Amino acid sequence: MKNAVYDAFPGVRRRGPITSKRVALTFDDGPDHMTERYLDALDELRVPATFFLVGGRAASRPDLVREYRRRGHQIAGHGYDHKRFNKLGRRELLEQCARTETALGGQLSGRPWVRPPHGSLDASSLVYLVAAGYTVAMWSLDSRDYGTTNPDDLVHECAGMSAGDVVLFHEGQQWTLDALPRIVAALHASGLECVTMHDLFAR
């Protein structure tokens, strides 16, 4: 689906207000063997983030689910089995989301957020999610950390960050960790502040 459709559809959040001087860093696909290193890096940089967790992985690591929240980050769902949402019928799609909420063990607050694995949405799956009360989280800037192992490439992709951007990263990759200090330094030099997605879109 095109970004213009997301921007016009109630219940979808892709880019925050450009007047806010804030951006949201988001990380998909955790928890995994590198989660604590990501959390330590964000602690050092003193920035909060939003983590979209795979329910099946979260169910096996409730300690890490709690740790994200303890360190001040927002957590949200990313499907239970990382299946493409646009390939699922209504029942299976909502079951994926409900099972993930259960795996997150009461660490959610307010209306639940969800990000479709691979950004895989069509009109039907989008309607199902919004009608069920989910806030659908997309992104406005893709770091493309899945297509390189060079931190310099990520820094280059993120050089155009501006107010309101929601930036897509992934857990489990050393090059993403290596690039983060430079990316955060650049956004601070531009007068931007890192916040969670919840705070970026708070009214």
Where are these regions (language model features)?
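Active-site beta->alpha N-cap acidic-glycine motif
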Residues: 1-88, 92, 96-99, 103, ...
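Catalytic domains of cell-wall/extracellular-matrix polysaccharide-remodeling enzymes
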Residues: 59-60, 83-203
